């Protein structure tokens, strides 16, 4: 039986979002209609996240809610796919017999067949966007070859596999023609792009060719600090449509912890990388991510992390408590920092970053900048600068005045005020 009305719930990161969008395009080609709500559908498909405990719990909660709908007769069928299934397929099958099928992260044809749809190789480049139409993500690789001790992604997604450049360019053309203005380049590790196929980094070559397509903004996310091709920073400085922004998760600075994490980099090398990137492009904004409460992290080691963050003054920073993941190598270590202490350390680090962010945002006050509008409501426009990625970074809150502003438009704005994580101002012109 072909599923005519399907509700797809996509959980987790932007990589998962791309997987869902690819599936949607294939299914729509077979006549399947996607609904806005579960109540309109006869089938539910949940694309799960299984990266950390909170994500697992959210996925389980959504599956159980969908099972209730099936038991009530609201829907006829229920399927589950994605990272959680990749890790716990057998356990899920045993505990959730009401689910009609479980699929991993590399079973797109099988999922489509279960839904009553056909897989078409020629449609692989096509996606039905779940993001607003003016920005999206380009996933340039699958899997990961790194062996970070805290991470289960290699088990979930497999070894690193760069997507063919020509396929990525075809996909990018389709996205550009659909109206996408901001292209966010992602994978588990963009630094390694090309190493598995060409024996060297091909990231800069790809970025140059994407830049030639005249996207308004191209942004780099998920760069690993080891093997990052520094020529990309020079290209960023030279090409106006490549955002002066780099997301490069460092996770920690203490040498003992970095070694235990198997990050392949030490504190001094991290500092040198930061300094080199900033020297090559003084206008760049750096985003990073830190982990607090890694097994054995002492108060002194955490204080060292605080000092590192204060000294290097990252433009954007996220911090997460260490999660003791069953399928990560660090699960063999004793998880000896209490949950309460982990949360306290996260809060302390983010309080420090709040002060850094406030200082950096204050520098924008009185200046005129270009903003991409994401949302408009009741005389206010909400958008981002080139220094802010969707969903995770700062937001600009702008009074529109007499200007007719719509999502997806670029505008000139004057910044009049700021908070640690927002800029406030007014629209003074349209681009």
Swiss-Prot record:
Q: What is its main location?
A: cytoplasm
Q: Which domain of life is it from?
A: Bacteria
Gene3D superfamilies from the entry? Methylthiotransferase, N-terminal domain, Nucleic acid-binding proteins, tm_1862 like domain
Q: Which InterPro entries match?
A: Elp3/MiaA/NifB-like_rSAM, Methylthiotransferase, Methylthiotransferase_CS, Methylthiotransferase_N, Methylthiotransferase_N_sf, NA-bd_OB-fold, Ribosomal_uS12_MeSTrfase_RimO, rSAM
According to the entry, what is the taxonomic lineage of the organism? Answer: Bacteria, Pseudomonadati, Chlorobiota, Chlorobiia, Chlorobiales
Protein name according to UniProt = Ribosomal protein uS12 methylthiotransferase RimO
Write down the chemical reaction(s) this protein catalyses. L-aspartate(89)-[ribosomal protein uS12]-hydrogen + (sulfur carrier)-SH + AH2 + 2 S-adenosyl-L-methionine = 3-methylsulfanyl-L-aspartate(89)-[ribosomal protein uS12]-hydrogen + (sulfur carrier)-H + 5'-deoxyadenosine + L-methionine + A + S-adenosyl-L-homocysteine + 2 H(+)
Could you give one GO CC term from the UniProt record?
cytosol
Q: Which compartment or compartments is the protein found in?
A: Cytoplasm
The residues that the entry says bind [4Fe-4S] cluster 1 are 13, 49, 83
Recorded hits in SUPFAM superfamilies, A to Z, give: Radical SAM enzymes (SSF102114)
Give the family from UniProt.
Answer: Belongs to the methylthiotransferase family. RimO subfamily.
Q: What does this protein do?
A: Catalyzes the methylthiolation of an aspartic acid residue of ribosomal protein uS12.
Co-factor note (free text): Binds 2 [4Fe-4S] clusters. One cluster is coordinated with 3 cysteines and an exchangeable S-adenosyl-L-methionine.
What molecular function terms (GO) are annotated for this protein? Answer: 4 iron, 4 sulfur cluster binding; aspartic acid methylthiotransferase activity; metal ion binding; protein methylthiotransferase activity
Query: What keywords appear on the UniProt entry?
Result: 4Fe-4S, Cytoplasm, Iron, Iron-sulfur, Metal-binding, S-adenosyl-L-methionine, Transferase
Positions of the TRAM domain: 362-429
UniProt binding sites for [4Fe-4S] cluster 2: 144, 148, 151
**CDD domains per record:** Radical_SAM
Species name for this entry?
Pelodictyon phaeoclathratiforme (strain DSM 5477 / BU-1)
> What are the BP-aspect GO terms?
tRNA modification
Its EC number is 2.8.4.4
The MTTase N-terminal domain extends over: 4-120
What HAMAP family does UniProt report for this protein, alphabetically? MTTase_RimO
What sort of enzyme, by top EC class, is this?
A: transferase
Q: Which cofactors is this protein said to need?
A: [4Fe-4S] cluster
């Amino acid at each position: 039986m072909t599923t005519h009305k399907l509700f797809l719930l996509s959980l987790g990161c932007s990589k998962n979002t791309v997987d869902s969008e690819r599936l949607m395009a294939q299914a729509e080609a077979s006549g399947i209609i996607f609904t806005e709500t579960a109540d309109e559908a006869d089938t539910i498909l949940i694309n799960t996240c299984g990266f950390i405990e909170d994500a697992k719990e959210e996925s389980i909660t959504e599956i159980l809610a969908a099972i209730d709908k099936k038991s009530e007769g609201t829907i006829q069928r229920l399927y589950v796919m994605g990272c959680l299934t990749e890790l716990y397929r057998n356990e899920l099958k045993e505990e959730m017999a009401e689910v009609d099928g479980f699929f991993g992260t590399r079973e797109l044809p099988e999922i489509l067949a279960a839904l009553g749809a056909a897989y078409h190789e020629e449609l692989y480049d096509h996606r039905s966007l779940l993001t607003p139409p003016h920005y999206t993500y380009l996933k340039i690789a699958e899997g990961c070859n790194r062996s970070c001790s805290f991470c289960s992604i290699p088990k979930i997604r497999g070894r690193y596999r760069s997507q063919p450049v020509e396929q990525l360019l075809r996909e990018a053309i389709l996205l550009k023609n659909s109206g996408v203005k901001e292209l966010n380049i992602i994978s588990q590790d963009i630094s390694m792009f090309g190493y598995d196929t060409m024996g060297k980094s091909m990231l800069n070559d790809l970025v140059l060719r994407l830049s030639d397509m005249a996207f308004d903004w191209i942004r780099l996310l998920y760069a690993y600090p080891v093997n990052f091709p520094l020529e990309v920073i020079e290209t960023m400085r030279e090409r106006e449509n490549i955002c002066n922004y780099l997301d490069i998760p460092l996770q920690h600075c203490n040498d003992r912890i970095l070694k235990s994490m198997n990050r392949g980099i030490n504190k001094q090398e991290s500092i040198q990388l930061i300094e080199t990137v900033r020297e090559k492009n003084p206008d760049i904004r750096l985003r990073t991510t830190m982990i607090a409460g890694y097994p054995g992290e002492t108060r002194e080691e955490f204080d060292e992390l605080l000092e590192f963050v204060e000294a290097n003054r990252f433009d954007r920073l996220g911090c997460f408590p260490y999660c003791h993941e069953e399928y990560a190598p660090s699960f063999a270590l004793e998880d000896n920092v209490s949950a309460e202490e982990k949360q306290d350390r996260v809060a302390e680090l983010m309080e420090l970053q709040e002060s850094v962010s406030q200082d950096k945002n204050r520098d924008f006050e009185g200046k005129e900048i270009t903003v991409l509008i994401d949302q408009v409501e009741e005389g206010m426009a909400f958008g981002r600068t080139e220094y802010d990625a969707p969903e995770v970074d700062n937001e600009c809150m702008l009074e529109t005045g007499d200007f007719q502003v719509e999502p997806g438009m670029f505008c000139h704005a004057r910044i009049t005020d700021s908070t640690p994580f927002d800029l406030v101002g007014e629209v003074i012109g349209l681009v």
